[in-house]
């Protein structure tokens, strides 16, 4: 599941800030924060779950095509989620290409990942084997 920064509107950011700010005037800060922030967090979760579920399903299909089984699937699933998060955070363009190239180098050297499979994962997520979407 996605962790970290996802695109949020200013009204979503303000709603979360207001819920946290109002909670600090209450002696039971932790429970108040959680109860006030829960609706905003649930909405964000429901908004982003379909995107990242689709990424997992699409990457899984690519891995099946390449015959990758067992624990090695986790390597490529993790790579796919990182690419999807980067696309969600920074959008397409040169910054995404740089991020993808860095992640590919890391996954190849650290996990001995197959560059062809990594390219296929990038292609299924961004629509381009290089990650550059114009």
From Swiss-Prot:
A GO CC term attached to the entry: helical viral capsid
Keywords recorded for this protein, A-Z: Capsid protein, DNA-binding, Helical capsid protein, Virion
Role, per record: Self-assembles to form a helical, filamentous nucleocapsid. The capsid proteins wrap around the DNA and maintain it in an A-form by non-specific desolvation and specific coordination of the DNA phosphate groups by positively charged residues. This certainly protects the viral DNA under conditions such as the extreme desiccation of its host.
Pfam families hit by this protein: Sulf_coat_C (PF12193)
Gene3D superfamilies (UniProt xref): 1.20.58.800
The keyword Phosphoprotein is assigned to this record: no
Locations listed in the record: Virion
Main localization (coarse): virion
Assembly, per entry: Homodimer.
InterPro entries linked to this entry: Sulfobus_virus_coat_C
Protein name: Putative capsid protein
Domain remarks: The N-terminus projects into a DNA groove.
GO molecular function: DNA binding
Keyword DNA-binding part of the UniProt annotation: yes
